[in-house]
Amino acid sequence: TLFNRLTGANVLSKDMLFATLDPTMRGMFLPSGRQIVLADTVGFISALPTELVEAFKSTLEEVVQADLILHVHDMSSDLCSEEASDVSAVLDDIGIDEQSRDDHLLHIFNKADIADKAVDIPFIQTGLNGRTIKCSALSGSGVDDLLNQIDEYFAQRDADCQIIINPEHAAASAWLHQNANIVESRYNAEGQHIIRARLSPANKARFHKHWPDIKARNT
């Protein structure tokens, strides 16, 4: 439901085992205009039969590669804390250790509209790494704050870079205009394209992978 609310998609959302077997990905824009890809993975469960464990983990490749992990907690569940522990155990199993979770995890406490008003969540948050936010995917309450937090996360990690591109690498210029926040764009007397841009760590790595001879130097 939260995935649909954020992306405007109409993906199957049911409280049942393996309602979605494969990750679903959709592009979306954050309040700043930054474009990201949001991936919705198969739900995490405990006591999974041994013969299904590896198949289950193989669907979580997007989690390992993600710049930011959104851990959605069901505030209305009596087992919210236990379910959070199950997710943490799976993250450990697929190689996302506690240090990585400190840097790349946002805890979203969903269903705030139907959670028992007599039950608060500080005890659940105690010991959890990362950032936290409370919202309701159904009513939309808190969703704007969530989007702003995601936006702020990426903005804080961006690097301000200067890239000098020779004429024969016009594709690199086009890629930057699609994947970076362009601050300045000009040409020098030699016909080189000089771009000042803000790049996320992931996009900076992707740029170097495609064009290893072009340096994106921090300014």
Question: Predicted regions span which residues?
Answer:
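C-terminal-of-GTPase-core extension/linker across diverse P-loop GTPases
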Residues: 1-8, 78, 89-219
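Conserved G1/Walker A P-loop phosphate-binding module
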Residues: 1-68, 73
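Extended hydrophobic-aromatic, low-complexity segments
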Residues: 13-15, 30, 35-39, 47-50, ...
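Residue-level detector of alpha-helical recognition elements and their boundaries
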Residues: 17-18, 36, 74, 84, ...
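Short, surface-exposed, charged/polar-biased interaction segments
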Residues: 23-27, 34, 42, 59-65, ...
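Conserved catalytic-core segment of NTP-binding enzymes
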Residues: 24, 50-63, 72-95, 99, ...
